[in-house]
């Protein structure tokens, strides 16, 4: 059934839709299946995403038609389709009238992903109007909270030097806590890897008691505050709350030094919101494990990394993993700095829409995935600043002289970048950074040709 007369209005102006403030706008790359027209398929997509189905129904009235999603722009040659969704379509909480990402996802990338006339469709960007944006929680705290705990300036406080305890699974409570203590003697921040929780060989309560003690000892030995991101992800919100309360009680006077990690992609908006609303004073660390199945450049369905990041900020993530923009081991490219800017800035340009965040707090980029001291300067050059949380697993524990030296090498690489000193030159007077060149020699050969001669290290 051709629904284009009802669900397509190419006379609508995007500027007028934005000025009106009553529509969420979404841009998709869409390809119809062979034998189906582009505009007709786009119309069916909009219908399925809002008020329609595959047939006309007798219960439709004029009010219903007034909240139709409308295709307002198509470019068949580019495979581009833009749809305007009236804000009244989206579900609101009965307890406080707030908007929810679950409803946004259900409409914009729900049933339309499985339609028989759609070969593939992927959301590339979306725009939220000002009044509707106010209905989302947004972040309660961000990296400035960590800088304050660390005793740094709350503006431009610089990189938080972090790690992920490796191996990601298989450590019992004491070896895990010992590894934390070692890294904290040189670094700032430790996160649970996303699978770490309450395994039978590492019960959460026993582990957290030992880690809390390790933090106290490291702070006493260094005179510097330390930070931990503890995984509270669970299927049951009550379990998440129980874990969170136990961890805060266990860390006691250092409770403000704790962040909560939530596997936001696999556990979903409910888990993120559970943390955001029950622990508003705690940094909400959104881990995105699994997202690549949807957001990868290889995937032609679902949504992009940028869309995922924007949803995380709306949900209230304090920080989210953004990848390494091609400088680490994960898929990415330098132009993905747009993703970080969308999280950090009050006004940011996406590929299709400029988003004004209306004063909503920023969300912090968390950098991880194959990063070592040698890769940091190029990453910072591309991003243009170093106000990120950086977590290196192998980049710290893979250092030839151990975790303390690994942490110090990361800190020294950051110092060199801030001072605009060549990394090889800085390594000549900083033993831990020099050790990073020896530890990650293949990176050094690729990024710093001639480093062996300059550091007088034999091949």
Curated annotation (Swiss-Prot):
Mg(2+) binds at residues 191, 193-194. The modification N6-carboxylysine is found at residue 191. It comes from the Bacteria. SUPFAM superfamilies: RuBisCo, C-terminal domain, RuBisCO, large subunit, small (N-terminal) domain. Keywords: Calvin cycle, Carbon dioxide fixation, Lyase, Magnesium, Metal-binding, Monooxygenase, Oxidoreductase. Binds 1 Mg(2+) ion per subunit. Gene3D superfamilies: Ribulose bisphosphate carboxylase, large subunit, C-terminal domain, RuBisCO large subunit, N-terminal domain. Its cofactor is Mg(2+). It is an enzyme of class 4 (lyase). Its EC number is 4.1.1.39. Substrate binds at residues 111, 168, 288, 321, 368. The record marks 329 as: Transition state stabilizer. Disulfide bonds: none annotated. It catalyses: 2 (2R)-3-phosphoglycerate + 2 H(+) = D-ribulose 1,5-bisphosphate + CO2 + H2O; D-ribulose 1,5-bisphosphate + O2 = 2-phosphoglycolate + (2R)-3-phosphoglycerate + 2 H(+). The keyword Magnesium applies. The active site is at residues 166, 287. Pfam families: RuBisCO_large, RuBisCO_large_N. One of its GO terms (biological process) is reductive pentose-phosphate cycle. GO terms for molecular function: magnesium ion binding; monooxygenase activity; ribulose-bisphosphate carboxylase activity. InterPro entries: RuBisCO, RuBisCo_large_chain_AS, RuBisCO_lsu_C, RuBisCO_lsu_C_sf, RuBisCO_lsu_fd_N, RuBisCO_lsu_N_sf, RuBisCO_lsuII. RuBisCO catalyzes two reactions: the carboxylation of D-ribulose 1,5-bisphosphate, the primary event in carbon dioxide fixation, as well as the oxidative fragmentation of the pentose substrate. Both reactions occur simultaneously and in competition at the same active site. NCBIfam families: PRK13475.1 (NF010002). Belongs to the RuBisCO large chain family. Type II subfamily. The basic functional RuBisCO is composed of a large chain homodimer in a 'head-to-tail' conformation. In contrast to form I RuBisCO, the form II RuBisCO are composed solely of large subunits. This is Ribulose bisphosphate carboxylase. It comes from Paramagnetospirillum magnetotacticum. The gene is cbbM.
């Amino acid at each position: 059934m051709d629904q284009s007369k009802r669900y397509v209005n190419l006379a609508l102006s995007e500027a007028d839709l934005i000025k009106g403030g009553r529509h969420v706008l979404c841009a998709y790359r869409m390809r119809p299946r062979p034998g189906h027209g582009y505009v007709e398929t786009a119309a069916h997509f909009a219908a399925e995403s809002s008020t329609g189905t595959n047939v006309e129904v007798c219960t439709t009235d004029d009010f219903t038609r007034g909240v139709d999603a409308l295709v307002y722009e198509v470019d068949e040659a580019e495979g581009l389709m833009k749809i305007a969704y009236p804000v009244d379509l989206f579900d609101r909480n009965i307890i406080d009238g707030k908007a929810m990402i679950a409803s946004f996802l259900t409409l914009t990338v729900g049933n339309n992903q499985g339609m028989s006339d759609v070969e593939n469709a992927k959301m590339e960007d979306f725009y939220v109007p000002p009044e509707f944006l106010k209905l989302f929680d947004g972040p309660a705290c961000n990296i400035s909270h960590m800088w304050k705990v660390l005793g740094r300036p709350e503006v431009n406080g610089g990189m938080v030097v972090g790690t992920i305890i490796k191996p990601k699974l298989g450590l019992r409570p004491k070896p895990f806590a010992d590894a934390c203590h070692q890294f904290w003697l040189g670094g700032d921040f430790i996160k649970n890897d996303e699978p770490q929780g309450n395994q039978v060989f590492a019960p959460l309560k026993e582990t957290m008691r030992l880690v809390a003690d390790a933090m106290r000892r490291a702070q006493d030995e260094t005179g510097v505050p330390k930070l931990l991101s503890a995984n509270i992800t669970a299927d049951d919100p009550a379990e998440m709350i129980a874990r969170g309360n136990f961890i805060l009680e266990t860390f006691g006077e250092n409770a403000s030094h704790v962040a909560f990690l939530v596997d936001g992609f696999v556990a979903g908006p409910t888990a993120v919101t559970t943390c955001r609303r029950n622990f508003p004073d705690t940094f909400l660390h959104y881990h995105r494990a699994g997202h690549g199945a949807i957001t990868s450049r290889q995937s032609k369905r679902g949504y992009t990394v940028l869309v995922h990041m924007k949803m995380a900020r709306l949900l209230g993530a304090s920080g989210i993993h953004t990848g390494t923009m091609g400088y680490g081991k994960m898929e990415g490219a330098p132009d993905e700095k747009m993703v970080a800017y969308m999280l950090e800035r009050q006004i940011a340009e996406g590929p299709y829409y400029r988003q004004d965040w209306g004063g909503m707090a920023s969300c912090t980029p968390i950098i991880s995935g194959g990063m070592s001291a040698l890769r940091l300067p190029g990453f910072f050059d591309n991003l243009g600043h170093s106000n990120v949380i950086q977590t290196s697993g192998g980049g710290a524990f893979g250092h030839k002289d151990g975790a303390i030296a690994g942490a110090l090498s990361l800190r020294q690489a950051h110092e060199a970048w801030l001072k605009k000193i060549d990394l090889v030159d800085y390594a000549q007077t900083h033993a831990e950074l020099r050790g990073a060149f020896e530890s990650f020699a293949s990176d050094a050969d690729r990024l710093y040709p001639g480093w062996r001669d300059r550091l007088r290290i034999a091949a």
